[in-house]
Curated annotation (Swiss-Prot):
Name listed for the protein in its UniProt record: UDP-N-acetylmuramate--L-alanine ligase
EC number in record: 6.3.2.8
Residue sites binding ATP per the record: 124-130
Similarity annotation: Belongs to the MurCDEF family.
Subcellular location(s) per record: Cytoplasm
One GO location term (cellular component): cytoplasm
One of the GO BP terms on file: regulation of cell shape
Leader peptide range in chain numbering: none
Record keywords: ATP-binding, Cell cycle, Cell division, Cell shape, Cell wall biogenesis/degradation, Cytoplasm, Ligase, Nucleotide-binding, Peptidoglycan synthesis
Purpose: Cell wall formation.
Catalytic activity: UDP-N-acetyl-alpha-D-muramate + L-alanine + ATP = UDP-N-acetyl-alpha-D-muramoyl-L-alanine + ADP + phosphate + H(+)
Pfam families associated with the record: Mur_ligase, Mur_ligase_C, Mur_ligase_M
Native source organism of the sequence: Acaryochloris marina (strain MBIC 11017)
Length: 487
């Protein structure tokens, strides 16, 4: 792949344009009136939106697409790929044969980042999308007119990207494939660092190495010292002037801390401290320590760019969240259905803790409220690498439903499956059931859910596509069945 993408007017073609990361870049470039095309094997609302904005969309990934784009053109289009696109892809092969410049999606984001003097890159193993959305929303509410690129859809700007006219860019910076090292932001935020993406990394040291290089590229760093890896390995890498820290404990030496945390109702109320001095009260329509930490990162960014705390608090009070990040899809007959992207053991634990708070609030209305976790494991490599950790991640669930593994394109090694994972979880949990297919899951939930249940759909695959049918079922059916005890 080549290294210098041209954003000055040459046509650009995205292979796999329907993906959340690729489509955000396509949206930004379309707003610049660049000739944009893309292909995706599965049409979705994202590709339809891009097409309505002027992009040429191919519904199949075929070599003829590249040939068509090259016809009558003085120069072949630049071709953008994500890590999910392999060299055996017919469009990729045709692009090579046609002499098209080929770039990774991170090359486009890196080029965009260099155009914004106040670029803000949000990195970290967990919490990137929510934190990016919070920071973007904060700057938007403060009339700073940011350009925003996130890995989720946000109602406030109607999608996963927004084009602004100011020097501010807020971008989610992905570490999953090592491309994090290409970014040189003015402000770098690191929420936490853990081993994940075992298809790319084999050790935490490899992950740390990528983040260390990213740190060297940041003018100013904002980091959570609640993360042991950051506290142990990163605090000595920057001077006090270039590193800003935050923590959920007022007893920790950090620039931004909190105290008097109150998880009440459907949100969080907390007092925010800046270098030991109270800034005031922050109210969030979000639950859970992880979301509070994400919001504190946004506070730190806001203060760094010169916002007064009352303006920050006013903005964050109305943040409505991002899709698939503890997204309350709907409620029927007292059953609350929540969609969440969590697919790593640590993410599952903190998300279930939030669901437990939600269930405690529901218990005021219903005689009993349970947390029901429906988990679709994502990738064989992740299930195998974190097998033991997954088995111990569901303690806050009253009922656990496990499906077969969503491969995400990985070959089945034949050594790991959803049933083995369900059995391992059952060794540490009293009520676990394995329902291999999504149809099985629908049938099971229709017969076992009851009023007061908080149902959390966990995973980065396609589990969430069953939620609309379940919601419709409970909206039109009679009262839910009483609990059936699993044996």
């Amino acid at each position: 792949m080549q290294s210098a993408v041209d954003l000055g007017g040459r046509p650009i073609h995205f292979i796999g344009v329907g993906g959340i990361g690729m489509s955000a870049l396509a949206h930004i470039l379309l707003k610049r009136q660049l000739p944009i095309s893309g292909s995706d094997a599965r049409a979705n609302h994202i590709t339809q939106k891009l097409e309505s904005q002027g992009a040429q969309i191919f519904s199949r990934q075929e070599a003829t697409n590249i040939k068509q784009l090259c016809q009558g053109s003085s120069a072949p289009p630049q071709v953008i790929c994500s890590t999910a696109i392999h060299e055996d892809n017919p469009e990729y092969q045709a692009a090579v044969q046609a002499g098209c410049p080929i770039f990774h999606r991170s090359d486009v984001l890196a080029a965009l980042m260099q155009e914004f003097p106040q670029s803000i890159a949000i990195a970290g193993t967990h919490g990137k999308t929510t934190t990016s959305s919070l920071v973007g929303y904060l700057l938007l509410q403060a009339s700073l007119d940011p350009t925003i690129i996130v890995g989720g859809e946000v109602a406030a700007w109607g999608g996963n990207a927004r084009t602004g006219e100011s020097p501010y860019l807020v971008a989610e910076a992905d570490e999953s494939d090592g491309s994090l090292v290409k970014f040189f932001p003015h402000i770098g935020v690191i929420t936490n660092i853990e081993l994940d993406h075992p298809d790319h990394y084999t050790s935490l040291d490899q992950v740390v190495s990528i983040f260390q290089e990213f740190v060297d590229h940041c003018h100013t760093l904002i980091v959570s010292v609640d993360c042991p890896t950051i506290a142990d390995r990163f605090l000595a890498l920057a001077t006090d002037q270039s590193m800003i820290t935050y923590s959920l404990s007022s007893k920790v030496s950090a620039d931004y801390t909190v105290q008097n945390i109150d998880y009440s109702g459907q949100g969080t109320i907390v007092e925010v401290l800046e270098r030991g001095e109270s800034l005031g009260q922050l109210e969030l329509p979000l639950l859970g320590e992880h979301n509070l930490s994400n919001a504190l990162a946004a506070v730190a960014v806001g203060r760094y760019v010169g916002l007064e705390f009352p303006a920050i608090a006013k903005a964050l009070r109305t943040f409505s969240g991002a899709k698939r990040r503890f997204e309350i899809y709907g409620e029927a007959q007292g059953i609350c259905l929540i969609d969440d992207y969590a697919h790593h053991p640590s993410e599952i634990q903190v998300t279930l803790a939030s669901a437990k708070l939600q269930a405690q609030a529901a218990a005021a209305t219903y005689s009993q409220s349970r947390v029901v976790a429906v988990f679709q494991p994502h990738r064989y490599s992740r299930a195998a690498t974190f097998f033991q950790e997954f088995s111990q991640s569901f303690q806050d669930a009253d009922l656990v439903v496990v499906t077969d593994i969503y491969s995400a394109g990985e070959a089945n090694p034949g050594t790991i499956n959803g049933k083995k994972l369900a059995d391992a979880i059952a060794a540490n949990h009293s009520v676990v059931t394995f329902q291999p297919t999504l149809t099985n899951v629908i049938d099971f939930l229709q017969g076992h859910l009851q009023s007061g249940d908080v149902v959390l759909f966990l995973g980065a695959g396609d589990l969430n596509r069953i939620i609309p049918d379940l919601l419709t079922h409970f909206q039109v059916s009679s009262k839910p069945s009483p609990e059936v005890v699993l044996k």
